[in-house]
Amino acid sequence: MKKVLLIDRDGTLILETDDFKIEKYEKLVFYPGVFQWLGRIARELNYDLAMVTNQDGLGTELFPEDEFNAVQDFIVRTFAGESINFVGVHIDKSYPHENLPTRKPGTGMLTQYMQGHYDLANSFVIGDRITDVKLAKNLGSKCIFMNDGRNLGAGETGADNATTLQPYIAIETRDWEQIYNFLKSLEGSID
């Protein structure tokens, strides 16, 4: 059965900005090492890759969708140019207070991975927010937590926090090389 890496965008593939919106090219900076090490994961290891991101209020006057889409398309094309291809790109546009099932940590936009074609127990969510860890819990997976200590997303996980979610964290790192080495070490040790 296939395995998948469900990878957050902002703070994981690209650097997070102070206003948590990347709708302009000037704000776009790719995460250090992401092309080299995610590229090796894509070429050498047996994982499908999917991008999963919450984009609060996308499509509103404050966060125009056409500007976002131009940058988003550039991001996806840049990864593809490095032979890093995503089987899916999943973008939730809602605000946290809307509590929609499609918003991480909800699994509503990821049902295609939950229909028995993917081995979620041996798959990973990779992200920098507590919501990414809780998403892993909700999927029956583990999280590779790119923890920067800011506790981002903690207000969206109910009673769960970094301590209560610790059993769902496979490793904590801020380094794509460590992620590659961790996943490589699992080769042959997972059914």
Task: Please tell me what each predicted stretch does.
Residues 1-49:
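Active-site neighborhood of HAD-like aspartate-dependent phosphohydrolases
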Residues 7-9, 53, 127-128:
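Active-site flanking residues adjacent to catalytic metal/cofactor-binding acidic residues
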Residues 15-17, 93, 147:
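Residue-level signal for short segments within beta-strands and strand-turn junctions
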Residues 25-30, 63-70, 104-105:
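Alpha-helix N-cap and loop-to-helix initiation/capping positions
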Residues 34, 38-71, 86-98, 136:
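Substrate-recognition element of Asp-dependent hydrolases with the DxDx(T/V) motif
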